[in-house]
A protein has these predicted regions:
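Structured, basic alpha/beta domains of bacterial-type, RNA-associated proteins
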Residues: 14-26, 32-83, 88, 92-145
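Intrinsically disordered, compositionally biased charged tails
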Residues: 1-19
Length: 145
């Protein structure tokens, strides 16, 4: 029998990122490791183009936002590894990592990206469930009689 699984897998993309800047971004429980270098505007997430990895148009706009703010959407190539959380957290972590890497390329971009709050880590996370309650804040149904 032939191994049909290996034929259906997408080929690994080899990218040269020798002269790149590295940064990590975080959001909720997601962590993004980002390598940024001068290039043609391609963004790879876990070996796939970001359009294929993230299906939502909202996430596409969110990820390209740092480049749109500095008007250099086609000047950088991005390779990143994202783990943990869901799509929204992963997209947020990716934006945070890209922004930090852009600041490493050019310190003058720091004030521009900071005013848009892209270099600041969004510390909001899910609140833990408390004992004696149904959820974090929701209590059990109360019956007078």
């Amino acid at each position: 029998m032939e191994n049909t699984q290996s034929a259906s897998k997408t080929p690994k993309i080899k990218l040269d990122f020798k002269d790149s800047k590295y940064a990590t971004g975080r959001r909720k429980t997601s962590i993004a490791k980002v390598w940024l270098k001068k290039g043609s505007g391609k963004i790879y997430v876990n070996g796939k183009l970001f359009n294929e990895y993230f299906s939502s148009e909202f996430h596409h706009l969110q990820i390209t936002r740092p480049f749109d703010i500095i008007n250099q959407s086609t000047n950088f190539d991005v390779r990143c590894s994202v783990s943990g959380g869901g799509p929204t957290g992963q997209a947020g972590a990716l934006v945070h990592g890209i922004s930090k890497a852009l600041v490493m390329f050019d310190e003058n971009l720091k004030s521009t990206l900071k005013t848009e709050k892209l270099t600041t880590r969004d510390s909001r996370a899910v609140e833990r469930k408390k004992p004696g309650r149904r959820k974090a804040r929701r209590s059990f149904q109360f019956s007078k009689r």
